[in-house]
Amino acid sequence: MTPRGRIAGPRRRAVDAVAALACSVALCALAPRHAHAQVRTADPIARGIPLTSFPRLVPLGAGVYGYEEIRAPGFTTVSLVVIGDSGVLIADGQGSAAATQRMLDEIRTVTSRPVRWYVVGSDHGDHTGGNGVLPTGIRFIVHPTSRAQLRRDSAAVVPPVAMTSDREQVDIGGRTVEVRFLGRAHTGGDLSVLLPRERILFMSEAYLNRVFPAMRSAYPSEWIATIDRALAMEVDRYVPGHGFIESPAVSREELVTFRDAVRDVVANVQGLHARGLTAEQAIAAVDWGTYKDWFLAAQQGPIAVRRIYLELDGKLAAAR
C-alpha cells in the first residue's frame, strides 16, 4: 500500500520520464541560438565581425594586447603590444603611416607609458611601411637579414643595429620579453616574441591564420621546421601576423593546420616538379584542394609554385 497522493511502480517511472523530457525541451528552448562553433576563416564577414569593429585591441593578458587592423583585400594585419613598467614594446607595425598612427592612438587608450621598443617580426612593407611615425629614439630589435633587406628596399626607417644572436631578452620593467629567431620561414629574418609568464608566442608572418602560405621571399621547406620548433615550445597561445587571434586551444589547432598547409603546398609542387613540368605548367596544373578557398590563394598560389621551384632547383640563394 502506498501513501496517499503518491504514484508507485510503472506509473511513477512513466511520470518521471515525461517530466525529464519536458525539462530537456525547455532547456533546449532556452539555449542561445548562436551557440555554435566559430567559423575557421580569415574573412571577418564570414566570422560575423563587421568591418566597423576595426582597428581593435584584443586583450591577451594583463598589459598584453593583440592589435588587429583590416588591410586590403579584407583581412587582418596583426601587431603585438606589451606594456611594462618602463614603457611599451610593439612587435610589428602596420602598412602605412596612417595605419601605424591609428595603432599608436589605440595604444594610448590603454596606457600613457611611452613606446620604447619595436620588434621587426617581418621586414615586409605591410608591417613596416608606417615605421616613420614611431617615436624618436625608439629601440629597434631586428634580425640582420631583415635589416639588410630594409636597407635594400630603401625603407623609410632602417634600424641602426641588428641582433647578434638568435635570442634576446628585453626588460621592459616588471616583465621580460624574449625575442626569438626560430629559423627562416616567410622571410629570411622572421622574429617571434615570447612572453614566458603568459605563455604567448607572437609569430608575425611565420604564422598566417587561414591565409594561403605567401612565399614571395619564403624558404618553403625550412618554414615547416620553424613552425615545428614553435609547436614544441611551452606556449599556450600562438598569435599570427595575419588572420584572427584565436583562443589558446584553437590557436594551436590553427597553427598545426597552417603548418600542414605549408607542408601540403610544398609536397604538391614537389610532385609536379618531379613529373618534369615547368613552373608555368605546374601553375596551370596544380590543385590546391581545400586551400583554394583560403584568403589570397588565387594571388599567392602561382608565387608559391615559382618559389618552391627555385628551392628545388637550388636557386633560392640568388633570389630575394
Each model region followed by its residue ranges:
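Divalent-metal (often Zn2+) His-rich catalytic cores of metallo-beta-lactamase-fold enzymes
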Residues: 224-277, 281
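Active-site HxH/HxHxD metal-binding segment of metal-dependent hydrolases
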Residues: 98, 105-172
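N-terminal secretory signal peptides that target proteins for export/translocation
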Residues: 1-12
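Bacterial N-terminal signal peptides
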Residues: 16-29
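C-terminal regulatory/interaction regions
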Residues: 274-320
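Conserved beta-strand hairpin/beta-sheet module of binuclear metal-dependent hydrolase folds
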Residues: 57-106, 191-195, 200-203
